[in-house]
Amino acid sequence: MPTINVKKADLERLVNMPLEDEFIEEKFPMMGVEVEGIFEEDGEKIIQFSINPNRPDYLSAEGLARGFRGIIGIETGLKKYDIESSDVKLYVENVETRPYIAMALVKGVIVDDYVLESIINLQEKLHWVMGRDRKKVAIGIHDADKVKPPFYYKEVSGDGIKFVPLNSDEEMTPREILEKHEKGIKYAHLIKDDKFPIILDSEGDVLSMPPIINGELTRVTTETRNLLIDVTGTDKYAVEKTLNIIVTALAERKYGKIHAVEVIKDNQSTIYPNLKEDVLETTSEYINKVLGANLTPGTIINYLRRCRLDAQFVDNKIKVFIPAYRVDIFGEIDIAEEVAIAYGYNKFSGEYPIIGTIGELNQLEKKCDFIREIMVGFGFYEVINLMLSNDEVLFKKMRIEDNNYIEVLKPASIEHRIVRKSILPLLMETLRINKHKELPQKIFEIGDCVVIDENAETKSRVVKKIAGVIVDNETNFNEIKSYVEGLLRELKIEYELDNFEHPSFIKGRCAKILKDGKIIGYFGEIHPEVITNFELEFPVVGFELEIE
Amino acid sequence: MELHIDEKRLLKIFQDNNRDEFNLNELEKFMPKEKILRVSLWLKGKNLVETEEKVKKIIKLIKEEEFPERKIANYLKQHNIKEIEIKNLKDILPKEEINAALGAIKRKGIARIEKGKIIFDNLDYKDVEEQLLQKIKENKYLDDFSEEEKKIIDILKKRGYVDFDEEKEIKIKLTEKGKEFIKNPIEIEEEITQLTRDIIISGKWKKAYIRPYDVKVPTKPIYPAKVHPLTRIIREVKEILLAMGFKEVKSPIVETEFWNFDMLFEPQDHPAREMQDTFFLKYPNEGDIPEDLLSKVKEVHERCWKYKFDENVSRRLILRTHTTASSIRYLASLSDEEKNKPHKVFCIDRVFRNEAIDYKHLPEFYQCEGIIMDDNVNFNNLIGVLKEFLNRLGFEKVRFRPAYFPFTEPSLEAEVYLEGKGWLEILGAGIFRPEVLEPIGIEKPVLAWGIGFSRLAMLRYGLTDIRDLHKNDLDWLKRV
């Protein structure tokens, strides 16, 4: 979940009213924005917000303020953003790896410290949420007065050009940037076949090398007044929407004006940004059915306007106009949610639905719970281990050789990388952890194990198992045999016993449990080598049984 | 008059010895001192004995060494000489004892000190102080010494060989009533400490004294064997859901991305699918998918998310990240006839997230997912169900706020209020999006919610570190 830090003073300026902390903490969650905290930094109050990934338009103070003014009702409906024409052109050649580009200007912005910080943060957050860490979308924001249109988007080779990248004072080739520059090193994997996308101005100066780095030439500072935004990527829709989010946010700033850029590719011209609203139709009947409410069309329209949408009631239908910076509205159901948010989630009465169904437990789970009762009756404590373990515990210490298990590709830790196929080793590990505690210790665990099964659709199968162990000053085969047979008797399982050579157990003191000729479990005295591998000093007996 | 067996024993000592009084120390060969003191207190309360305490000054021996002047004499005797220069005393005595020796020699007149020399006439001199020390060993009571002897004792005190102390001498005497009492025979029964079968059937207990216990003395605590605290929470939740008419369902732990993500309308390039959050399998790594469903899901994704769907991604195997996969598998399994009926199902199972392990996170944890499908269920009903569920879990105050999940709309998060902690997020919920239900041919609304058990467990058991749940410390499992 992305978070952003907003200066409270900046937010108040954008909302155009003073805001109490309590008011912020109460109201923002109502619009789906979580307030993580309010704290002071360098004598200034900061609010940390969590933004849902479906609302990238909230990833800036400007976007948050726009939404907030709507939800509290001081400015509602679709925000109109005028787009002034310009004679700026961008000529696009074929850039195979990042074929899409959109560009726009926002002029007249007073870039104070707040605005500068907001711009940098928005770019960074959008790189992740819209751009999947620049792979899908990358953004360049430039001081437009430092370069001369028209602009060109093309591919160059690794040593085909030289420029000073951002935060550097050394001229580098694209290949050198990948080798030496911090951003180049980090995003080198996004460049293929020595082909580097590049944006140039009419004098051959570099604006940026997407998706890696901007040029130092067009660095935005507090002296910048006119901003040029480029968005490149592999996904046309995402590129266009990202541009819309950025230019509308900047236009929220005082004196900010959006200017169009003509993008020409293969003699075909497109004007950006395209802020034409989307249109959806719904009905009050649909909204009320989804929400379980009884709202009139007029009321619904008012609620939609608080969400900065617009709506009209035409021919018994509600026609909804959706701003171009929204990426989360696909259909009627999304309109219903907007109404619910504006209405207020806590105003719903919460009517319990009367639906006649019969409650029922999973049969295998019922059996497992019955087994728990038996084991507790026998005096065993239940433990629950994680299913993810490692080969040291599962195999090596148990004197078992096994290569047929499920392993994760990138584990959370070295100890948690193999999915268990047996529970007994984890009980031995539990005894190790408790080795200084009072004896006797009797523990059991019931749980899922996963084994490979090439015939299953997920190439694996869940097997439910129970295992138990006892460590005591004196314990032997006879004791564990009595418990195992007691359990089998209660479960009404018809079984046979036979000698079993299992490497974790003492030979001649281990038995397998057969049902219809098939091994369903085993028990006996644990081998002293296994006992010492788990740092124990007393005899241990144990068993494991499949449950079906 | 009813007497405790020990009271009888003590009185019998007076009777058997034909004496009216004893010093406490004389009685100690019959009975431990602590018991004598306790029992005599009881008898005093019954006016059968009285006690007399006399505080006596005693002399305590502190040092049992030869006097330094005697050491000099012994040295001279060993070397067959009768005099020594004072400057040579350092060979015989430590420095701090030399002055003490010289002072004693002058005071006692046992040798002459002339011209820097000590001259003994008689190396076998008699020393009154030494004799008195020996006497003190035999009799420590100060009052038994003469005035002359007491003066010498004061000198010994100054020299650090003895000190004064006090000792209580306790005398236990029969009262007149007590004297009358012991004129009659005193009968003492056998004492029983442990009832046995033999004692029961033989009737010995009728004539025996069964020793009483102090009922407040602490005994070793015993704990019942019990199920794991997580199991207790799972049982509690299942009981609530059964009462609400829910049926339990299960699904695979190893899942394809198709069922875990694609079916739930999560775009294939969503950040949650990256390595950081999901456990992908090294081996095996690819599973099977129902082809007809795959093509429908692909169509929905490409239409709505406007990207190119990759079927190879769908087949990848992972450890499931939520129990919603259970619900969607259940819905997909419904026949046309079953789709016409209402359904309430739940799944409680383990899910896996690739998160760094710390006090708040584990790579796997329990989750509960519930869904309700019926013709006319709505968002207000969802809130009603969640309020009922959370109230039954013991949370009185519940509130809701907007949230985001890729597969539900509207979506919400529920918070509960805890005294001293404030509002706490407890579960997420929503109504399945049409894009989720379309490929499986379901047109009724489906309400859905999920709750993680880690937070419940931490609240219920007062844990501050989630890792404690699976550490399996047996002391904790006994007490919790």
UniProtKB/Swiss-Prot annotation, chain A:
| Keyword presence, Aminoacyl-tRNA synthetase | yes
Give me the Gene Ontology terms describing cellular component: phenylalanine-tRNA ligase complex
| Subunit | Tetramer of two alpha and two beta subunits.
Which residues take part in binding Mg(2+)?
Answer: 328, 334, 337-338
The scientific name of the source species is Methanocaldococcus jannaschii (strain ATCC 43067 / DSM 2661 / JAL-1 / JCM 10045 / NBRC 100440) (Methanococcus jannaschii)
GO biological process per UniProt: phenylalanyl-tRNA aminoacylation
Query: What reaction gets catalysed by this protein?
Result: tRNA(Phe) + L-phenylalanine + ATP = L-phenylalanyl-tRNA(Phe) + AMP + diphosphate + H(+)
Please give the family membership noted in the entry.
Belongs to the phenylalanyl-tRNA synthetase beta subunit family. Type 2 subfamily.
The protein's Enzyme Commission number: 6.1.1.20
Question: What are the B5 domain coordinates in residue numbering?
Answer: 275-350
Which cofactor does the UniProt annotation name?
Mg(2+)
| InterPro entries xrefs | aa-tRNA-synth_II/BPL/LPL, B3/B4_tRNA-bd, DNA-bd_dom_put_sf, Phe-tRNA-ligase_IIc_bsu, Phe-tRNA-synth_IIc_bsu_arc_euk, Phe-tRNA_synthase-like_B3/B4, Phe_tRNA_ligase_beta2_arc, PheRS_beta_core
The name of this protein is Phenylalanine--tRNA ligase beta subunit
The kind of enzyme this is, by top-level EC class, is ligase
What domain of life does the native source organism fall in? Archaea
The UniProt entry, under HAMAP family, shows: Phe_tRNA_synth_beta2 (MF_00284)
Locations listed in the record: Cytoplasm
Q: Single GO molecular-function term?
A: ATP binding
- PANTHER family in alphabetical order: PHENYLALANINE--TRNA LIGASE BETA SUBUNIT, PHENYLALANYL-TRNA SYNTHETASE BETA CHAIN AND LEUCINE-RICH REPEAT-CONTAINING PROTEIN 47
Going by the UniProt record, its keywords in alphabetical order are: Aminoacyl-tRNA synthetase, ATP-binding, Cytoplasm, Ligase, Magnesium, Metal-binding, Nucleotide-binding, Protein biosynthesis
Q: One Pfam family, short name please?
A: PhetRS_B1
From Swiss-Prot, chain B:
User: Which locations, inside or outside the cell, does it occupy?
Assistant: Cytoplasm
Which GO terms of the cellular component aspect does the record hold?
A: cytoplasm
List of residues binding L-phenylalanine: 324, 407, 432
TM spans, by residue?
none
Q: Name one Pfam family in it.
A: tRNA-synt_2d
Any note on cofactor binding? Binds 2 magnesium ions per tetramer.
Cofactors per UniProt? Answer: Mg(2+)
The lineage's top-level taxon is Archaea
Q: Which residues are listed for Mg(2+) binding in this entry?
A: 409
Coiled-coil regions in this chain? none
Q: Which GO terms describe its molecular function?
A: ATP binding; magnesium ion binding; phenylalanine-tRNA ligase activity; tRNA binding
**Known catalysed reaction(s)?**
tRNA(Phe) + L-phenylalanine + ATP = L-phenylalanyl-tRNA(Phe) + AMP + diphosphate + H(+)
Tell me the enzyme class: ligase
Biological process, per Gene Ontology: phenylalanyl-tRNA aminoacylation
Q: Where's it mainly located?
A: cytoplasm
Q: Which UniProt keywords apply?
A: Aminoacyl-tRNA synthetase, ATP-binding, Cytoplasm, Ligase, Magnesium, Metal-binding, Nucleotide-binding, Protein biosynthesis
Q: Give the record's subunit note.
A: Tetramer of two alpha and two beta subunits.
Spell out the family assignment given in the record's similarity comment.
Belongs to the class-II aminoacyl-tRNA synthetase family. Phe-tRNA synthetase alpha subunit type 2 subfamily.
Record's protein name: Phenylalanine--tRNA ligase alpha subunit
User: Where does this protein come from, organism-wise?
Assistant: Methanocaldococcus jannaschii (strain ATCC 43067 / DSM 2661 / JAL-1 / JCM 10045 / NBRC 100440)
